[in-house]
């Protein structure tokens, strides 16, 4: 399984990165490569095209419906609907309840058909089996309906926190994960609003408790120093830590 960081800027695009978007690739037993995208935040579709033909994406999984995690689905809709090669078959898009309706509204489309001719929308209800992937969505703590994702393929595990406040759900998402991709939007030692995000210290603590083998710190807003988030995580996690950066590739 391979993870490519497409966008990792927290809350809005930064000068060096779009908002949240991650490309995951894995081969099935026949050698076919399956490609899924986790989130499609502001500016992500442009950068995604550096690494893959968007028409080769097999599915998209949206962690929650804040713009920095989903709004470029409106651009992806245009790409699939009006591509010169002709209309594309709908691909699966998984997300919280109301994902299809919200995205149609964002592009000022009528509720029916909305984007249903391009995307086959499904609400998170349980485990998802797709090609070589077994994906387990788990509700996390955020001001809106939000999910973290545990992705298993070929004996490897990738945990993705999505956006979340402190919650033991992260322990299930990251349990014994080969790689834990975890947000750290807040700084330690300041009066952060409750129920929204976590700090680098928290990310490290969850990685430690979950016995994750490697921690990738992501979703740091441009107004914060990302190096601080990594330093915080190092104070609570002794394993390998890296800061997510656009274009970085990890073999999980």
Q: Which role does the model predict for each range below?
A:
Residues 72-80, 106, 225-233:
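Metal-dependent catalytic neighborhoods of phosphoester/phosphodiester hydrolases
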Residues 166-250:
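Cap/insert and terminal regions of metallo-dependent hydrolase folds
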Residues 86-146, 153-154:
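Metallo-beta-lactamase
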Residues 42-92:
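Active-site metal-binding motif and surrounding structural segment of the metallo-beta-lactamase
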Residues 41, 141, 165:
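Adenine-nucleotide cofactor-binding loop residues
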Residues 1-52, 146-162, 179:
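Conserved beta-strand hairpin/beta-sheet module of binuclear metal-dependent hydrolase folds
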Residues 37-41, 58-64, 68, 96, ...:
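Active-site neighborhood of phospho(di)ester-bond hydrolases with catalytic His/Asp-centered motifs
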